[in-house]
């Protein structure tokens, strides 16, 4: 018994930061959770989950979502020929959450209130037990106050508690199951981000700082409440980044086959993305051999490097099974069902087709289908790229404003390189190259639809298909910004200012939105004002920061303005996520769903809006 307790204690000490990161991410995601549907595409996933749960077939919509009360299919499913031709990945992994909802019934929210309270208490206990130096502010022990507050909040939640129905007309248990699954994935994603940065920067305060920025400089928290697969894709992509970094910076060669297994698994969720990730990972393998030849000599050690891409087949097994269930062919993806009636494809592929080996006809048809999805207009290509990156024509949030550290890199690096000659270690250069290759894989995977992405009102509220790119771009920014002494030497004060900004600006912005936000007549135009305001604010702060930083380093002016602007810059994406969460909950969930799970949050929302 003593040996067991000693082992547990060693594990807790070794992974104390990982545990704290998981608890914090889990707690924050539950706090802002409001399971809903934002886009009609989500009808497919929730129908798949419903029919899986009931033990029914999952190819055709049986009418729970996306149908009118008289049993008539909506225009969306008429266009889709009533097929549920999305991968079954997210519905399958959401089944355990659905079974948990079955156990609790209408009082699943009661379970969530208890879980939320225990998470808060667990956070305090971890801080007290493993990080006592951070448990006090001056002479005041804030963790004691938080314990008292957790019981006050628990009693308040019980007072305001009301059940959420999971049976009957206005019930959406599938929404809750998928949202809960997304929250778990989000929490594990946060732990993987910490491990990536710990491997790059070692055990340092900069790792914690970088983890916070990687999670907040994205849209991942926002998407946890909805039934799209963006959190799942981000989770898998983050795992690929983790294994790639571990391969580069440790001596364990088996991380490389793991990268390709995860890429095969990514194909189950997003085959079009996995294809390009695989291609750029092959370039990554070649690059690894060139820069680390000594690691792979004699040639017997290089065998794993050469054969690693073949491990993709192992990860792709669920993808192939999914294809067979829908199309009767291991190599033909389910979404082909939506194309089989088009003149461009004919009747080459159909769900009644028996299993066939890969042939030139099959590959040719798939290539034809892929080419038919390309939506690039050469005359507007550059303006479309500019729009997607900074100011989409649709009014959605561009990619760059949500990754301010990456923009700092482009503003600061040239000046710093000229005047101070920034040096990168061999390990940092490897990481930068890996992040560049993985970023390119995401961008090129979806550049085929750049015109539609820039203009489509359905690509909202951010460039959601490009959301995996947030992580590698922020890591690039962290590596570069880590070379600035003014940032590295003032992490504590910067973090204090970031948290202070969140505490002050988020409530003020929510109140301002409730009073002055120009709510449009159409939901599709809902996001433009907030996105424009946040984007413009980030760009202005970015320019001012660059000026102040140059003044400090070149002309020896005070560093305080630069640090304050940097803190505001880092805080802005998370403010956008929270504001967008409340905005969508107030106005943009007409397709169905629940309000905030936590009763205190629900009352706060009602008080503001």
Model-predicted segments: where are they?
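Transmembrane helical bundles and short interhelical boundary loops of multi-pass, membrane-embedded
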Residues: 164, 493-609
């Amino acid at each position: 018994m003593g040996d067991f307790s000693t082992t547990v204690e060693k594990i807790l000490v070794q992974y104390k930061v990982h545990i704290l990161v998981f608890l914090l991410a889990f707690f924050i995601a539950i706090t802002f959770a409001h399971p809903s549907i934002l886009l009609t595409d989500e009808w497919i996933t929730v129908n798949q989950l419903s029919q899986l749960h009931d033990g029914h077939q999952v190819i055709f919509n049986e009418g729970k979502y996306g149908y009118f009360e008289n049993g008539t299919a909506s225009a969306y499913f008429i266009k889709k020929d009533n097929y549920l031709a999305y991968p079954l990945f997210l519905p399958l992994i959401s089944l355990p959450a659905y079974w948990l909802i079955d156990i609790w019934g209408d009082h699943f929210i009661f379970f969530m209130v208890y879980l939320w309270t225990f998470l808060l208490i667990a956070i305090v206990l971890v801080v007290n037990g493993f990080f006592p130096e951070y448990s006090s502010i001056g002479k005041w022990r804030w963790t004691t106050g938080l314990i008292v507050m957790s019981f006050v909040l628990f009693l308040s939640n019980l007072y305001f508690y009301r059940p959420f129905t999971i049976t009957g007309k206005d019930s959406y248990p599938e929404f809750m199951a998928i949202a809960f699954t997304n929250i778990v994935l989000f929490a594990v994603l946060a732990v993987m981000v910490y491990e990536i940065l710990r491997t790059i920067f070692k055990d340092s305060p900069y790792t914690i700082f970088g983890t916070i920025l990687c999670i907040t400089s994205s849209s991942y928290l926002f998407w946890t409440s909805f039934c799209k697969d963006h959190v799942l894709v981000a989770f898998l992509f983050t795992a690929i980044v983790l294994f790639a970094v571990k391969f580069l910076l440790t001596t364990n060669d088996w991380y490389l086959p793991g990268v390709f297994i995860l890429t095969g698994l990514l194909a189950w969720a997003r085959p079009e993305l996995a294809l390009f990730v695989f291609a750029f990972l092959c370039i990554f393998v070649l690059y690894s051999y060139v820069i680390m030849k000594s690691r792979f000599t004699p040639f017997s050690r290089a065998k794993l490097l050469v054969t690693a891409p073949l491990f993709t087949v192992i990860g792709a097994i669920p993808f192939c099974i999914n294809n067979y269930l829908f199309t009767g062919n291991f190599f033909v993806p389910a979404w082909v069902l939506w194309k089989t009636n088009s003149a461009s494809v004919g009747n080459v592929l159909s769900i009644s087709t028996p299993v066939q080996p890969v042939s030139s006809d099959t590959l040719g048809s798939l290539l034809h289908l892929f080419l038919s999805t390309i939506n690039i207009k050469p005359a507007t290509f550059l303006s479309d790229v500019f729009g997607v990156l900074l100011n989409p024509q649709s009014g959605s949030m561009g990619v760059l404003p949500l990754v301010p550290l990456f923009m700092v890199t482009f503003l600061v690096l040239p000046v710093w390189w000229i005047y101070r000659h920034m040096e990168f270690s061999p390990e940092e250069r490897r990481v930068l190259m890996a992040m560049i290759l993985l970023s390119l894989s995401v961008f090129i995977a979806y550049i085929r639809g750049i015109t539609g992405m820039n203009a489509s009102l359905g690509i909202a509220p951010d460039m959601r298909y490009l959301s995996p790119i947030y992580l590698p771009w922020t890591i690039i920014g962290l590596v570069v910004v880590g070379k600035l002494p003014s940032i590295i030497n003032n992490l504590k004060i910067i973090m204090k200012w970031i948290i202070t900004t969140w505490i002050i600006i988020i409530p003020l912005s929510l109140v301002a939105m409730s009073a002055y936000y120009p709510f449009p007549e159409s939901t599709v135009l809902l996001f433009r004002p907030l996105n424009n305001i946040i984007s413009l604010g980030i760009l202005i702060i970015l320019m001012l920061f660059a000026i102040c930083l140059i003044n400090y380093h070149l002309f020896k002016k005070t560093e305080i303005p630069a640090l304050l602007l940097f803190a505001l810059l880092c805080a802005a994406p998370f403010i956008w996520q929270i504001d967008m969460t409340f905005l969508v909950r107030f106005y943009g969930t007409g397709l169905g769903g629940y309000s905030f799970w936590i009763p205190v949050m629900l009352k706060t929302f009602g008080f503001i809006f």
